[in-house]
Amino acid sequence: ECLDLPEKTYVACSGGPDSMAILDFLIRGKRDVTVAHFNHDTPFGRFAEKFVKSYCEKNDIKLVIGNIQKEKDSKESWEEYWRNERYKFFESLDGPVITAHHLDDVVEWWTFTSFHGNPRLIPYRRNKTIRPFLSTTKDEIWNWVDRKDIPYVTDPGNFDDKFARSYIRNNIIPQALKINPGLRKVIKKKVEKHYEDEERE
């Protein structure tokens, strides 16, 4: 049985392995999904749009595409700029949007925000966005990709350490896991308690 999610929803899909896995999972769960793809107006962004468009056409999946709407503010990092534009697009849609954020993303975000003195978790729900896979590890998602032979594209920016989140993902998290191999379990407990608190509100 699929998760307790709306029967009709958008799925944020970048074309990467995480979002392609979640899209496949929801389609197999007989959900009425429309792919919401955002083009970040980079060479890879244009390539990813072609990939997602081709996949949706081949599999008869509805698709909407969002694009950059304003120039970058000099005070914003590129990561902030792309994220803000992407979420503006999601908020413009006429229904809930499921994203593929997983437990490893939460660990990364918690670490990133800790460096700024305010450790935070990724919420399960905010405005139109639903993140139902926050207790699922990246390895579990990749296992689904391998088992179902799901195609995907890889964003080279994920390996570019000039981006703070990439640097944390590629360098700091591996070292943190050596110090505390149970870090994911610690964060998972925080996530599940946070979800329970959200549901009570």
What are these regions (language model features)?
Residues 1-171:
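Core alpha/beta nucleotide-donor-binding catalytic domains of modification enzymes
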Residues 162-201:
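ATP/NTP-dependent adenylation/nucleotidyl-transfer catalytic domains that generate, transfer
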